[in-house]
Amino acid sequence: MKPKTIIDKIWENHVVYREEGKPDLLYIDLHLVHEVTSPQAFEGLRQKGRKVRRPDLTFATMDHNVPTVNRFVITDEVARNQIAALERNCREFGIPLADLHSEEQGIVHVIGPELGLTQPGKTIVCGDSHTSTHGAFGALAFGIGTSEVEHVLATQTLWQHKPKTLQICINGRLGKGVTAKDVILAIIGRYGVGVGTGYIIEFTGEAIRRMSMEERMTICNMSIEAGARAGLISPDETTFAYLRGRKYAPKGEEFDKAVERWRALASDEGAKYDKTIEIDASTIAPMVTWGTNPAMSTSVDGVVPHPEQFESKTEQNAVRRALEYMGLKPGTPITDIPVQHVFIGSCTNSRLSDLRAAASIVKGKKVAPGVRALVVPGSQQVKKQAEAEGLAQIFIDAGFEWRDSGCSACLGMNPDIIPEGEHCASTSNRNFEGRQGKGARTHLVSPVMAAAAAIYGHFVDVRQLEAEPVC
């Protein structure tokens, strides 16, 4: 039998209908829903007199527009209406909802895995581009638009052209202070935001295998920033250990049977990819973005580049525009860039291990004068556990603001806005113009890099710092 990739296996397992020259009709195993991209979809069902085909394969929460200081005081009318609409729609159509009173509420891409909804071999969709996060479990997960949200609600299927396959192999071990966030930023920085266009990426190699599930989620989360339709990692013992005992994961003998099926999903030895990229893990350093897309990045010991370093006029002009927006001069050492804001959170880096890592840098220190620092847990479960471990108190003692769960300052859609012209060291995934607020200047970094920037008031090389034990 011809060796297959995990991408091929999952895709073929879910084709409901195929016609040459047309998209395949795929069955969807899990549909995650939030308040921003779903109201029009539900209204479409209502107008057409349709029901949700599989409420049991649908799960909803609110995250994008949720205030993180007091979640029950929603002053923005649009946000208030969207949240109320989600509650109303879930009641009407019988969809499970983790609402603002629920201990299970959080960012949709954080709670899916922690509840055990996300499982290997599943097709998973959500009206959010960072649905690729769930690929860390060996699932085929991708974002969809509002019209597609309606289609999945009504039919539990989706029309999709099959992308090509791209293997990115990270060989060897990562050095001290280098994290999963640095790996994905380095990939995008070296190969560009279009490297994955037209592909689904499978991440492989020793460095990936040595990562925890939460680190793998960071990698897959930002595969969309590399232009890919999705990103995933073949499941292994780390995957199975994470899922065991989760609320919606199989139990007892059923779990053992599931593990047998999940093991068979891994890409076969000798499977062919349309393209392969290999990277030596030891060449990756802590990364910082200096521009207005995730590829505009360099190592923390680097400098802001000159436009003339880039080959094409188009690239040179893009760099000039980015530097003007960011208020940076070519040749400036990255460690000389001051920050006025620090945001530790988002679906990329708001899990318990992220907060532990950040707290290990912060413990016993104080936030630098003139810096406002936020820590926003990715879910209420993460918040509860972080408080139980004493992590929250470490942040509070250092001068950080400790918040409720939500998307927060990742995007300029809720009260957590970065002011115009100010620099923010952010653990989120996008640094486009205005992403964190009009005129906000975003630098994407890992949780430890963000924590260090909060303490020192500028970027520092975390490889030169000593972390404190926190648990």
Curated annotation (Swiss-Prot):
- One Pfam family per UniProt: Aconitase
List the cysteine pairs that form cystine.
none
- Quote the subunit structure annotation: Heterodimer of LeuC and LeuD.
Q: Which HAMAP family match?
A: LeuC_type1 (MF_01026)
- Natural source organism: Geobacillus kaustophilus (strain HTA426)
- What is this protein's function? Catalyzes the isomerization between 2-isopropylmalate and 3-isopropylmalate, via the formation of 2-isopropylmaleate.
* Range of residues in the leader sequence: none
State the similarity comment: Belongs to the aconitase/IPM isomerase family. LeuC type 1 subfamily.
Keywords (alphabetical) are: 4Fe-4S, Amino-acid biosynthesis, Branched-chain amino acid biosynthesis, Iron, Iron-sulfur, Leucine biosynthesis, Lyase, Metal-binding
Q: Does the keyword Cell division apply?
A: no
Reaction catalysis annotation: (2R,3S)-3-isopropylmalate = (2S)-2-isopropylmalate
Return one GO MF term: 4 iron, 4 sulfur cluster binding
List the taxonomic lineage: Bacteria, Bacillati, Bacillota, Bacilli, Bacillales
- PROSITE patterns, sorted: ACONITASE_1, ACONITASE_2
**Pathway it acts in?**
Amino-acid biosynthesis; L-leucine biosynthesis; L-leucine from 3-methyl-2-oxobutanoate: step 2/4
Which cofactors does the annotated protein need, by name? [4Fe-4S] cluster
Co-factor binding comment: Binds 1 [4Fe-4S] cluster per subunit.
- Give the EC number(s) listed in the UniProt record: 4.2.1.33
Question: Does the keyword Metal-binding belong to this entry?
Answer: yes
Q: Please state what class of enzyme this protein is.
A: lyase
The lineage's top-level taxon is: Bacteria
Recorded protein name is 3-isopropylmalate dehydratase large subunit
Report the Gene3D superfamilies cross-referenced here: Aconitase, domain 3
Q: Which GO terms describe its biological process?
A: L-leucine biosynthetic process
In this chain, [4Fe-4S] cluster is annotated as bound at C347, C407, C410
